Amino acid sequence: MSSRAETPRVPFLDLKAAYEELRAETDAAIARVLDSGRYLLGPELEGFEAEFAAYCETDHAVGVNSGMDALQLALRGLGIGPGDEVIVPSHTYIASWLAVSATGATPVPVEPHEDHPTLDPLLVEKAITPRTRALLPVHLYGHPADMDALRELADRHGLHIVEDAAQAHGARYRGRRIGAGSSVAAFSFYPGKNLGCFGDGGAVVTGDPELAERLRMLRNYGSRQKYSHETKGTNSRLDEMQAAVLRIRLAHLDSWNGRRSALAAEYLSGLAGLPGIGLPVTAPDTDPVWHLFTVRTERRDELRSHLDARGIDTLTHYPVPVHLSPAYAGEAPPEGSLPRAESFARQVLSLPIGPHLERPQALRVIDAVREWAERVDQA
């Protein structure tokens, strides 16, 4: 038996290391909640909502149970429902569509840019109909969408914008954070997000006090006051434990995003010019937060197998376009109708990235990708 220690795998994301870095603060915050005996709609949630709103450079944050609930409640708060249409990206996680469907409205898919994973405004305008009530851009992979162009379209056609910022905590567009200046933006605090908790969680941010008040009612059974129900709400409350954890992590978010950006720069430099590998593009006037570092190649499955054999974990975001998911069979456009989304689904591969990925691990990823690309080029 060999005495040489086996080389550890490069994890896609190390959630345990994130906890270990802040263990003392986190354990103290959890103990504080347990000792308080207050587990819902208490001071931790109030504190987090105020701090997250300030971080997003806006006035109000409303904590809810998940990112999808954040989207759904934002749409409901704007009065969107049956008979309405909402323009969504064809290339996104299915939650962006499901939130629209949950209101009774119809998601209308529009393609992304050919070289950037966010909505193409030139195609958005062609999809607007008299039934369109809102645009739902997704800041996918941590890259801000072209908000100026989308706002101009929304203003001209009298539409709402609901931003899906589930992957974009701290990202900036024209110097302002995502959520600043928007009518409403929805965030997820799923554990793997740039700002994640220890389970599910989400929040809606807005500068509109009336919308914020409606959202607070909707998340709490349609009630402002116990047993007085003004509308048909739901149960979607960010609990005190998760809020306490998020307050700790929010203070470290910019630092952790900075680590992600440094790793992305390492990847962009080390993988530049490789044949058959498309690298992510940063749009002008944007500061992405690199929730994911996603490359594109027509031989994606081969590259993924090669990296797996080299002890490197990867993921695919996302392998099945939403319009081809069985969940939308008979409702969404048929195969071949959204070629850009289908191209992304066929080609994308996300490499390990996160605030606790060490530089030597990133260099190991680069070496393995280069090895594969050069071998394929010579074949």
Swiss-Prot record:
Binding site for pyridoxal 5'-phosphate: G67, Q167, S188, F189, Y190, P191, G192, K193, Y221, Y227, N235, S236, R237, Y318
SUPFAM superfamilies: PLP-dependent transferases
GO MF terms held by the record: pyridoxal phosphate binding; transaminase activity
GO terms classed as biological process: macrolide biosynthetic process; polysaccharide biosynthetic process
Keywords, ordered alphabetically: Antibiotic biosynthesis, Pyridoxal phosphate, Transferase
InterPro entries found in the cross-reference section: DegT/StrS_aminotransferase (IPR000653), PyrdxlP-dep_Trfase (IPR015424), PyrdxlP-dep_Trfase_major (IPR015421), PyrdxlP-dep_Trfase_small (IPR015422)
CDD domains: AHBA_syn
Residues with the N6-(pyridoxal phosphate)lysine modification: K193
Keyword GTP-binding listed: no
Metabolic or biological pathway: Antibiotic biosynthesis
Cofactor: pyridoxal 5'-phosphate
Catalytic activity: dTDP-3-amino-3,4,6-trideoxy-alpha-D-glucose + 2-oxoglutarate = dTDP-3-dehydro-4,6-dideoxy-alpha-D-glucose + L-glutamate
Superkingdom, taxonomy of origin: Bacteria
PANTHER family named among the record's database cross-references: 3-OXO-GLUCOSE-6-PHOSPHATE:GLUTAMATE AMINOTRANSFERASE, TRANSAMINASE
Function: Involved in the biosynthesis of dTDP-alpha-D-desosamine, a sugar found in several bacterial macrolide antibiotics.
Quaternary structure (record): Homodimer.
Protein name: dTDP-3-amino-3,4,6-trideoxy-alpha-D-glucose transaminase
Native source organism of the sequence: Streptomyces venezuelae
